[in-house]
Amino acid sequence: MKNTNEDLLKRHICELEEKLLSAEVRTCPEELSGLLTDDFFEFGSSGKVWYKQDLMGEDGAGEVRMILSGFELHLLSETAALTTYRILNEETGGATLRSSIWKQQDGRWQMFFHQGTPAGSPSHI
């Protein structure tokens, strides 16, 4: 059985990942800024590399309709964690495998790195 603290952390970071999928957060640069480290970068499922400053425009990261499933947390240290999960894009029907590295800084967890990889049919990550 997993440590209760690890279970709580898994729930907390999953909630943060889900926040990053919400229109309210994705379209609000101030909200995004609080969830991403200053040196955040992403390898998008499109193949494009994104940096935090790319997402800080008036519209933020833009709106999406996605469903998260299969969330897993892998502790790297007391202040770093890797998350893996699957996303279903409700608009296109496409699926991607996702991974993120989260760092705890100044008492809060922020995303440092994110990657999306196009996936085939549903399967276990």
Annotate the PLM regions.
Residues 2-34, 39-125:
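A beta-strand edge to alpha-helix "cap/lid" segment located at domain peripheries
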